[in-house]
Amino acid sequence: LGHHLNDVIETTVMGMFYGAQIQGMMPKLHSTNFEGMELIRPLYRINEKDIISWCKYNSLEFIRCACRFTENDESSHENISKRKEIKDLIAELKKINPNIEKNIFNSIHTANFDTLPGYKIFGEEHTFLDYYYGDKNDRSI
């Protein structure tokens, strides 16, 4: 799949702002639709600007994205997607903190479950109360 670093960052922020959850995007996962198939995102750690620069340098053109959520008409404010809004917000935040993208990306790779009151793993929801009254040494998820 063609998802890149900025897609991962934007998805993380969108999940928090619009989905009320902390979520990321996996670099590799098993398909839920096709048994035995793996989905791989080889551009997972590559910045969108670097991809665009590389394409320009090699005189390559992008094909139209099949994802309807990325389509928007810049001249019409009604058609600007939530992802575009998040992209613009991150660009503004980057002026204040140049490391904002790196920090958002790293935050989903260093989640501290000890400080989260709730989490979901493999579709099963848990709360801090699952281990709060039990064995303090048993912190397994």
Question: Where are the predicted features?
Answer:
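Active-site adenylate/phosphate-handling loop in enzymes that bind or generate adenylated species
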Residues: 1-49, 104, 121, 125-128
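Mid-to-C-terminal catalytic subdomains of enzymes
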Residues: 4, 46-106
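Surface-exposed, flexible loop/turn segments at secondary-structure boundaries
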Residues: 7, 70, 112
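A short, terminal or domain-edge coil/loop segment
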Residues: 10-16, 54-62, 87-91, 119-135
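Phosphate/oxyanion-binding loops and surfaces in catalytic or ligand/nucleic-acid-binding neighborhoods
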Residues: 15-20, 96, 107, 111-114
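Membrane-targeting and insertion segments and their boundary/processing signals
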Residues: 25, 74-78, 135
